[in-house]
């Protein structure tokens, strides 16, 4: 079994469970998937990846709520576009900081705030759980790969493994 196959199996099971539980708990299922996607995209692994995901996603939620709030306080023609422009600039500038250097994570948090219609409290919980979902998928995939192939450990992570496996096939 390839690492990608092991990761796919574990991810399918865990995401199915998340989707079911999110509905029961009144959480936003797709937002959890956004958090999970951010985890895999941020380039970090383990708790460093969770930390990077949570910091950037929640900063994005704050930016999204700022845009929504300022647009309500100053209801002028075109003000939503003006506030979006200003806050987008801020999101790009703060990416110079190591804390916020995964700018797509910040944008993910911001646009999910709009998609969740500003329901930030449920959104935040869903995004954070999604970050841990990504963590669980990655480590579960590693566990299954090791168990099936009888390797003591997987030396590489998701992106590297996929590339390595492609080279081995060629």
Predicted regions: what they are:
Residues 19-33, 68-85, 89:
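Structural signature of hydrophobic alpha-helical transmembrane segments
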Residues 1-45, 123-124, 135-145, 149, ...:
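Alpha-helical transmembrane segments and their membrane-interface boundaries
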Residues 27-44, 85-119:
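Pore- and pathway-forming membrane helices of multi-pass small-molecule/ion transporters and channels
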Residues 6-18, 51, 55-67, 82-91, ...:
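Hydrophobic faces of alpha-helical transmembrane segments in multi-pass integral membrane proteins
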Residues 147-170:
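Short, highly charged, low-complexity non-transmembrane loops/tails of multi-pass membrane proteins
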Residues 3-4, 41-53, 72-76, 115-123:
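Membrane-helix interfacial "entry" motifs
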Residues 23-28, 72-76, 96, 100, ...:
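Transmembrane helix-loop junctions in multipass membrane proteins, especially transporters and channels
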Residues 48-58, 74, 99-109, 122-131, ...:
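A cytosolic-side transmembrane-helix exit/cap motif
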């Amino acid at each position: 079994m390839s690492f990608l196959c092991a990761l796919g199996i574990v991810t399918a099971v865990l995401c199915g469970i998340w989707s079911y539980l999110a509905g029961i708990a009144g959480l936003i299922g797709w937002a959890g998937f956004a958090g999970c996607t951010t985890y895999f995209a941020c380039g970090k692994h383990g708790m460093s990846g969770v930390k990077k995901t949570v910091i950037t996603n929640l900063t994005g939620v704050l930016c999204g709520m700022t845009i929504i709030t300022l647009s309500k306080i100053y209801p002028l023609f075109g003000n939503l576009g003006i506030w979006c422009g200003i806050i987008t600039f801020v999101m790009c500038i703060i990416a110079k900081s190591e804390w916020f250097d995964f700018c797509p994570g910040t944008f993910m948090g911001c646009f999910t705030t709009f998609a969740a219609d500003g329901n930030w409290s449920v959104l935040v919980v869903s995004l954070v759980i999604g970050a841990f979902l990504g963590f669980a998928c990655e480590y579960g995939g590693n566990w299954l790969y090791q168990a099936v192939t009888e390797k003591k450990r997987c030396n590489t992570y998701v992106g590297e493994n996929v590339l390595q496996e492609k080279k081995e096939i060629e």
